[in-house]
């Protein structure tokens, strides 16, 4: 068995999973596991700078590229900025960012993101159809609009055997310290 080449995502721009796959010539789709409006817990509320209990849309999806499970993604979006979204859209095939931009006028412009290597949990193993011990890239991101409003808190688990990240780094010159004699 030869494993397929890993999907290589750059870390230089903010884009949706759907946009990333389209740019690579791959078909993005999703399996929606959970889609509800619920009260934000402390962690979600803190990330979105709102009070605990504030209504959020919780959208949990398995993200697929050419029908292969790539990531398990749990998004929390402020319900106030996207009223009625779950009733009008099918996120098995539609892009969340595209809906937020086109229907609600939200322009996601930047994010704060952390990435760390972990071993997949039982729910992640099941959702991503992988074997025990499979490494994942755990990503936590808060996404902001052009009005500097935090509107999305997302936790993702990307299969380490199918996904990798790439970035280009540039040396920043630091001033030389004056050395005395």
Predicted regions span which residues?
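All-alpha effector-binding/dimerization core of bacterial HTH-type transcriptional repressors
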Residues: 4-181
């Amino acid at each position: 068995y030869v494993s397929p080449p890993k999907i290589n995502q750059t870390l230089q721009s903010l884009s949706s999973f759907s946009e990333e796959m389209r740019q690579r010539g791959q078909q993005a789709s999703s399996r929606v596991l959970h889609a509800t409006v619920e009260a934000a817990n402390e962690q979600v509320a803190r990330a979105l700078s709102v009070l605990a209990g504030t209504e959020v849309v919780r959208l949990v999806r398995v993200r697929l590229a050419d029908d292969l499970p790539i990531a398990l993604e749990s998004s929390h979006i402020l319900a106030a900025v996207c009223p009625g979204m779950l009733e009008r859209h099918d996120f098995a095939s539609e892009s969340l960012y595209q809906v937020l931009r086109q229907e609600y006028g939200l322009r996601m412009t930047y994010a704060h993101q952390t990435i760390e290597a972990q071993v997949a949990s039982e729910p992640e193993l099941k959702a991503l159809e992988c074997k025990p011990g499979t490494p994942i890239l755990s990503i936590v991101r808060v996404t902001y609009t052009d009005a500097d409003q935090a509107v999305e808190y997302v936790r993702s688990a990307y299969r380490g055997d199918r996904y990798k990240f790439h970035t280009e780094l540039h040396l920043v010159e630091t001033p030389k310290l004056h050395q005395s004699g």
